[in-house]
Amino acid sequence: MRFRTYKNTDLTVSEVGFGLWTISTGWWGNFTEGEAIALMHKAFDLGMTLFDAADTYGNGLSEELIAKAFPNQRDEIVIATKVGYDFVHHGEARGRGQREIPQDFSPEAVTRATDAALKRLKTDRIDLLQLHNIRMEQVYDDALWKTLEKLKSEGKVRYYGIALGPAIGWLYEGVNCIRERELTSVQHIYNMLEQHPGHAFHDAATKAGKETMFLIRVTHSSGMLEGKYTPETKFPPTDHRSHRPRSWLLNGIKKVEQLRFLENAERTLGQAALQWLLADDRVASTLPNIYDEQQLVEFAKAPDTVPLTSDDMAKIEELYSDNFCVEEEPPKFKGTMELPQETAVA
């Protein structure tokens, strides 16, 4: 495993981290507590030190899993979590889907959520607190950012940032927040197949002269870039991918075939997908979706595989600019996200 340090901080993270999204939400299949903790222990043994949770993942479950998995290793791991969704009052309304629930970014709610997360994590500090899917209103809410500074001064939070996704959007929220605020970290979707709006976030930080670095989620385009899907692939009903249109699967397979040149005897396509991300020094860490031990080992070894060449990078850029030679309707991205009215009612 290799490590990177966020600029102007003492926050060092493994280049491949462990996102608890897959083992705590039920959207990637169901895991027993024992199965989830076993994967986390294996990740730690493989050198992963960054564990990324959210208070809304499993209505607090992801944070509780960290506390149970690492009761005696607090100084050896980096804990990142997220606040912003009012799951205390609306968690049961979400059901199995990816439906959003109401948010509350008031200073009181953020403070309360942070204190609750600390209790679930059984720790005295959160290494990286992320505002979960902020809207434009929060970008310009000075009271919110003063609250984060207060939490930092109290020692409850070491560093803070924002986390955007899983829906692809939040372009202007992300870009404006990077420009207007001093963020240690921005977590967002980014991979060889889905480069928007992530590329815009990275460019915004560079152009604004900001030291913000990035945590990358959905590194393999919901498993597509692992290169294992076929037209016959079927997902269980509890898996969120079962709700995607069939065109997503068929067109994705066609795109992946154009990337097979990245595979070789020393590197899988899944590892190449992580190497593509790590070629950008603005990326602090990657958070692949992990749901079995074989995959965990493959991803953990990715930083030590052969890096992509400049020719590889240029070829990927060329393919992306031509949509990987696949004809399909262009995706409809939302530049500014809005919480649907029907989910905003208590």
Spell out what each predicted region is:
Residues 6, 18, 36, 51, ...:
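Conserved, mostly hydrophobic/aromatic
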Residues 30-43, 103-121, 168-177:
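Short, acidic/polar
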Residues 8-10, 68-75, 118-122, 149-152, ...:
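Acidic (Asp/Glu)-rich catalytic clusters
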Residues 1-78:
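N-terminal binding-site loop/beta-alpha segment at the start of enzyme catalytic domains
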Residues 134-319, 323, 333-346:
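Beta/alpha (TIM)-barrel catalytic core signal, keyed to glycine-rich beta->alpha loops juxtaposed to Asp/Glu
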Residues 9-27, 80-100, 128:
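N-terminal small/glycine-rich loop or linker at the start of catalytic domains
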Residues 31-35, 65, 98-109, 136-143, ...:
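Alpha-helix N-cap and loop-to-helix initiation/capping positions
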Residues 118-137:
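Active-site groove signature of glycoside hydrolases
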